[in-house]
Amino acid sequence: MKAVVLTLAVLFLTGSQARHFWQQDDPQSPWDRVKDLVTVYVDAVKDGGREYVAQFEASALGKQLNLKLLDNWDTLGSTITKLREQIGPVTQEFWDNLEKETEVLRQEMSKDLEEVKQKVQPYLDDFQKKWQEEVELYRQKVAPLGTELRE
């Protein structure tokens, strides 16, 4: 009985995080992924730094100096948050402009490649024709040798 319950629990708990094919979530843009990673990193640094500052203030040296670093750390954290909020739209605008410019370049490159393809196509056709003729000549030359070896 325990094995059945354990098996069902593992089955449902691991399957509950699965992504079904009918879910139509839009994929996250690279910029959103970078923003999320930076946010996670900054939050981790803030939390880790807060712990170290609290430990320092609790120590004898911290009590003796009475620097109140924890208050300064909180101020620094709120300043970083405000800065991130102010920089967000500017960086988003930068990435949007970059995407537009790269799209224009991509279209120009596609057009140029199509022109090159059209210019090169006659040469490729001529090469293929000559190649087929050469192969046919070699076949004709080798055919008597093949029949000779079979006999």
Swiss-Prot record:
Region of interest called 4 X approximate tandem repeats, as start-end residue ranges on this chain: 67-143
Organism in which the protein naturally occurs: Panthera tigris altaica
Quaternary structure note: Homodimer. Interacts with APOA1BP and CLU. Component of a sperm activating protein complex (SPAP), consisting of APOA1, an immunoglobulin heavy chain, an immunoglobulin light chain and albumin. Interacts with NDRG1. Interacts with SCGB3A2. Interacts with NAXE and YJEFN3.
Gene Ontology BP terms: acylglycerol homeostasis; cholesterol efflux; cholesterol metabolic process; lipoprotein metabolic process; phospholipid efflux; positive regulation of cholesterol efflux; positive regulation of phagocytosis; positive regulation of phospholipid efflux
Tissue: Major protein of plasma HDL, also found in chylomicrons.
Keywords: Cholesterol metabolism, Glycoprotein, HDL, Lipid metabolism, Lipid transport, Lipoprotein, Oxidation, Palmitate, Phosphoprotein, Repeat, Secreted, Signal, Steroid metabolism, Sterol metabolism, Transport
Signal peptide (from-to): 1-18
PTM-bearing positions, type Methionine sulfoxide: 109
Function: Participates in the reverse transport of cholesterol from tissues to the liver for excretion by promoting cholesterol efflux from tissues and by acting as a cofactor for the lecithin cholesterol acyltransferase (LCAT). As part of the SPAP complex, activates spermatozoa motility.
Keyword Transport: yes
Name of the protein described by the UniProt record: Apolipoprotein A-I
Modifications the protein undergoes after translation, according to the UniProt entry: Glycosylated. Palmitoylated.
Family to which this protein belongs: Belongs to the apolipoprotein A1/A4/E family.
Lineage: Eukaryota, Metazoa, Chordata, Craniata, Vertebrata
Subcellular localization(s) per the UniProt record: Secreted
Family annotation (Pfam families): Apolipoprotein
Tree of life domain: Eukaryota
PANTHER family recorded: APOLIPOPROTEIN, APOLIPOPROTEIN A-I
Chief site of localization: secreted
GO terms of molecular function: cholesterol transfer activity; phosphatidylcholine-sterol O-acyltransferase activator activity; phospholipid binding; protein homodimerization activity
A Gene Ontology cellular-component term: extracellular vesicle
